[in-house]
C-alpha cells in the first residue's frame, strides 16, 4: 500500500500533467506547477475521490501546496 504522500503526489502528477520530480513538498500548485483555478478545483475533487473524504471549500482554498494537501489528507484520515 502506498503512503498518503505517494498517493497525493501521484494524483498531482496525473491532474496537472507535470513530471514526478517537479512535485516536491514545497511546490505551489499555481506558482510552481502551473495550475489555474480550474486545475485546483479538479485536484481537490480527485483527492476527495481517492481518499473518500469531503474537503469543504474554505479548507480547499488553503490547500495551495503539495505539503498542504498531504497534511490535510493525513489529518482527515486519523
From Swiss-Prot:
Listed GO biological process terms: lipid A biosynthetic process
PROSITE patterns according to UniProt: CARRIER, PHOSPHOPANTETHEINE
Pathway as given in its UniProt record: Lipid metabolism; fatty acid biosynthesis
Protein's cellular compartments: Cytoplasm
Residue ranges of domain Carrier in the record: 2-77
KW Cytoplasm (keyword) present: yes
Pfam families per UniProt: PP-binding (PF00550)
In-chain residues carrying the UniProt-annotated modification O-(pantetheine 4'-phosphoryl)serine: 37
Entry GO CC: cytosol; membrane
One term of GO molecular function: acyl binding
Main location: cytoplasm
Transmembrane portions of the chain: none
InterPro entries: ACP, ACP-like_sf, PP-bd_ACP, Ppantetheine_attach_site
PTM comment, free text: 4'-phosphopantetheine is transferred from CoA to a specific serine of apo-ACP by AcpS. This modification is essential for activity because fatty acids are bound in thioester linkage to the sulfhydryl of the prosthetic group.
Keyword Aminoacyl-tRNA synthetase included in the entry's annotation: no
The entry's keywords: Cytoplasm, Fatty acid biosynthesis, Fatty acid metabolism, Lipid biosynthesis, Lipid metabolism, Phosphopantetheine, Phosphoprotein
Role this protein plays: Carrier of the growing fatty acid chain in fatty acid biosynthesis.
Family: Belongs to the acyl carrier protein (ACP) family.
Name under which the protein is recorded: Acyl carrier protein
